[in-house]
Curated annotation (Swiss-Prot):
Family note: Belongs to the DapA family.
Superkingdom of source: Bacteria
Positions that bind pyruvate: 44, 202
Protein name as catalogued: 4-hydroxy-tetrahydrodipicolinate synthase
CDD domains named in the record: DHDPS
Catalytic reaction(s) noted: L-aspartate 4-semialdehyde + pyruvate = (2S,4S)-4-hydroxy-2,3,4,5-tetrahydrodipicolinate + H2O + H(+)
EC number(s) from the headed UniProt entry: 4.3.3.7
Keyword Cytoplasm tagged: yes
């Protein structure tokens, strides 16, 4: 259902307020670059520091600006099941085509708790839903066996697998078959994960290089394996640079350096250190981004 190069879009701020004009411009930059779908209010969109009104407004702006040209997949995850249901329902009402739900963080549920959480949302809201497994951030790993149980529900259509583990992604693919799509959640392994059977990537790098990320994915699905492999290697350095500090600090810094929006992040995220910013500038110059 959702495939290809999918951007986890940044939320631009201006003096502490969501910059709606710049957000619309960033959406246009993505569509012009061949991006296949857009995720507002994900990790990269600083969803955890948006208030409810801002969260809904960001989704609304992206849905309006996209105007059905590509799917919009709203980040609606929470560590409260009731809140996740409410946010997913709001996203549906705002016109989102799907929802991306991170595993409940901090409270460290068991696999049974994770299963019941996702099933509760899937039962409550008739909207295509993508599981989001990122244990490095959440403190809990959604295991392949649990994914296989969840894949039986018609509203659970995909998983963003961001463990960085090809083994775990492969186990999900082996257990679930065609009952659920796998999307890569780590830019630096998009190509090998697609080789295992993933249908695309939810990308951070696409915020600054949408054409190139789309070129990698498009080459792969066109059967041009050598071209895709070359894109994988070309993009490796910038992919790594996007994570030299906590996401989305590097990518927002990059967006700022390119003059596309402010590099402003919200506390407790802090501006990039000078040392890392200099490293990022050096890499971006190699790619002729600045």
């Amino acid at each position: 259902m959702f495939k290809g190069s999918i951007v986890a879009i940044v939320t631009p701020f201006n003096k502490g307020v969501v910059d709606e004009k710049k957000l619309r411009e960033l959406v246009e930059f993505q569509i012009a670059g061949g991006t296949d779908a857009i995720v507002p209010c994900g990790t990269t969109g600083e969803s955890s520091t948006l208030d409810y009104e801002e969260h809904d407004r960001v989704i609304e702006i992206v849905v309006q600006q996209v105007n059905k040209r590509v799917p919009v997949i709203a980040g609606t995850g929470s560590n409260s099941t009731r809140e996740a249901i409410e946010m997913t329902e709001h996203a549906k009402q705002l016109g989102a085509d799907g929802a991306l739900l991170v595993t409940p963080y901090y409270n460290k549920p068991t696999q049974e708790g994770l299963y019941r959480h996702y099933m509760a949302v899937a039962e409550a809201v008739a909207l295509p839903q993508i599981l989001y497994n990122v244990p490095g951030r959440t403190g809990v790993n959604l295991l392949p066996e649990t994914v296989a149980r969840l894949a039986e529900h018609k509203n659970i259509v995909a998983i963003k697998e961001a463990t960085g583990s090809l083994q775990q992604a492969s186990e999900v693919l082996a257990l679930c078959g065609d009952k659920i799509d796998v999307l890569c959640g780590d830019d630096f392994i998009t190509f090998p994960m697609m080789a295992c059977g993933a249908k695309g990537v939810i990308s951070v790098v696409a915020n600054i290089m949408p054409k190139e990320v789309a070129a990698l994915v498009d080459a792969f699905f066109a059967g041009k394996m050598e071209e895709a492999r070359q894109w994988h290697l070309k993009l490796l350095k910038i992919s790594n640079a996007m994570f030299i500090e906590s996401n989305p600090v590097p990518v927002k810094t990059a967006v700022g350096l390119m003059g596309k929006a402010s590099d402003e992040v919200r506390l407790p995220l802090a501006p990039m250190s000078d040392a890392n910013k200099n490293k990022l500038i050096s890499v971006m110059k190699e790619y002729k981004l600045i």
